[in-house]
């Protein structure tokens, strides 16, 4: 399942959300993927469930890391922009266009930070479903 690299622009939050939505396809389809690739008991001998689960786990981890990196990159870029705009506002506190732009960037930063929470929920859900179906076939390495 090829997904965008997450190198899209952080300028347009709506565009960035769309990129994340596409990147979350693997998580959205985890149940279908498990149902079509991990064998039931009656077909257990025909497919190497351990290898299948291992590959799916690696795909999930790669997707999660890619999205996390993209979100954090945009948070860093937007934080820098907010800091720069705040410094400019100190020099020119009457500039309404500057104040409006600062508020826009602050809102975008808040939305980007909320995407980290969304990402945590999506990741937890996917790993829960994965573990329910693959726990007998593959034990992922411990993280953290």
From Swiss-Prot:
Protein's gene: mix23
Coiled-coil segments on the chain, per record: 82-120
Keyword Cytoplasm attached: no
The protein's name: Protein MIX23
Record keywords, A-Z: Coiled coil
Sequence similarity: Belongs to the MIX23 family.
GO terms for cellular component: mitochondrial intermembrane space
Disulphide bonds in the chain: none
């Amino acid at each position: 399942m090829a997904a965008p690299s997450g190198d899209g622009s952080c300028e347009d939050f709506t565009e960035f959300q769309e990129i994340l939505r596409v990147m979350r396809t693997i998580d959205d389809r985890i149940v279908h993927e498990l149902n079509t690739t991990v064998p039931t008991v009656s077909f257990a001998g025909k497919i190497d469930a351990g290898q299948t689960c291992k590959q799916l786990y690696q795909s999930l981890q790669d997707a999660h890391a890619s999205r996390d990196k993209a979100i954090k990159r945009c948070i860093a870029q937007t934080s820098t922009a907010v800091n720069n705009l705040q410094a400019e506002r100190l020099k020119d506190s009457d500039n309404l266009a500057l104040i409006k732009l600062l508020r826009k960037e602050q809102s975008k930063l808040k939305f980007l930070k909320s995407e980290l929470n969304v990402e945590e929920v999506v990741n937890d859900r996917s790993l829960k479903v994965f573990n329910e179906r693959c726990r007998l076939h593959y034990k992922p390495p411990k993280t953290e």
